[in-house]
Amino acid sequence: MYSRLTTPQQNIWNLQKYYADSAISNICGAIFYDTRLRTDILSQAINKEIELQTGLRLQFCEIDGKPAQYVADYTYQDIPVRVFNTKEDYAVFANDFARQPVKLTGGKMYEFCIVEVEGRSGFIVKASHLISDAWSFSLFAHEITSFYNTLATGEQIPENDFSYIDYIETEKQYLKSEKYANDRKFWAEKYPAMPEKSIIKYSVSPISKLSSDRFSCQLSEADTKSIDDFCSESGISQAVLFESAIMAYLARINEENTSVTIGIPVLNRSTKKEKSTVGMYISTMPLTVPVSKQMTAKELCASLTSAHREIFRHQKYPYQNILQTIREKHNFTGSLFDVMVSYQNAKTDASGKTEWYSNGYCETPLELHIDNRDNSMQYTITADYQTELFGSSAEIELLINRILGIISQIVSAPDTTVEQLDILTESEKQKVIYDFNDTAVDYPRDKCVHELFSEQAARTPDKVALVFEDKQ
């Protein structure tokens, strides 16, 4: 039985069709357990996930030029096992694995591989965004681990009736509902004027490629604790704190702007069943807030918290519809934001560490992921950035350090205004204030400056002596 694509799937389909033969719609991650597991039982557990989560078995085709999907029959699969002597050898494999395209039609949209690295077992999975999202990968980790433990004790795994196909009917009902009409009205009225573009970095020419690279860093336990303590005491989420710091930075480097816009992903799963179902649900929303240089960091956090509550009530409305409405209303092309900010905290009870791999492409100039999924005492910050815009990972590292510096200031002095926030790191301030102004040189101490000037003029009479703006 063939079914139409949902709106989130259609967006991925269009993207993959445009960037054919690329890995742009791949999503890839792995989990490593704290010990070695039996690969035969782990293979059975993975197969059980494929059997029960029918969304994994979705396959795609075109009928009369339109995309369609169907659930392929389940057949037991031999999951390959790869053994690596070092983490470095595994990293080479994983990064290559993540960047191998998944074919759009004619076959399965995922690939599992069991891996063993330095005495630890785990598995890596790559899937098309047509059938999965970041939440789905948390389900993989949780369910496959649970299935392994159940099978290892000889117990039976209960059946479930989770099917992504059910979401097609849910979406159809939403598109005919009063809720949809209210959401459409909200977003149509949200931007009476053209939203100001919050540019992260100016480019002398249009970006023609979406090739990307990735940079990651980890906060210290002390910094992580100070962030968590501040958020708890202030009654705000960690996502809001990180977003506030990024918005303050964007406001400072876009001096003329009176508002700042970033993109945020939304789970788009409203029921327990949807939260237990593998599939592509996730959507994007523009988050726009007024930012004045005189508002305090505390006020910015409060404004963002209110903005979250407001737009989350209308999160089901498709982003492409939002974008189309604004484009038609204000006659513009392009995107609404340069920066996507994603705070990931979906927990799993699996006793292991998750890792995520880049597919080598990035739709947005900069995508920042703040990861708090492994019950760790340290946040991981990952930046995917377009290499045509940003020259190197050193540039991204500097940018992240600026953001972390702003967060530190907000945490220690929340009444600091946006205008007062330092947007340079301590090392940058040292360079700008002291190193660049270190003009001391040796010169003959027995002569006056006007004598030295006269002698220099006699030696090089045709050289420029003074520059003022465009005059010499």
Kindly give the residue locations of the regions a language model identified.
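His-Asp-centered acyl/peptidyl-transfer active-site segments
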Residues: 16-27, 54-56, 106, 120, ...
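Active-site-proximal acidic secondary-structure segment that organizes catalysis
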Residues: 2-4, 8, 115-165, 393-412
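Short, flexible turn/loop "capping" segments at secondary-structure junctions
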Residues: 20-26, 72-74, 117, 124, ...
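Acyl activation and transfer enzymes in specialized metabolism, enriched
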Residues: 33-57, 125-142, 213-257, 295-299, ...
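A short, small/polar-residue-rich loop/turn motif at beta-strand boundaries
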Residues: 1-4, 35-51, 70-106, 184, ...
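Short, low-complexity Ser/Thr-rich regulatory SLiMs
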Residues: 60-62, 114-118, 370-374
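Short amphipathic alpha-helices and their capping loops
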Residues: 1-20, 43-89, 93, 106-108, ...
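AMP-binding/adenylate-forming domain of the ANL superfamily
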Residues: 2-17, 90-94, 137-138, 181-182, ...
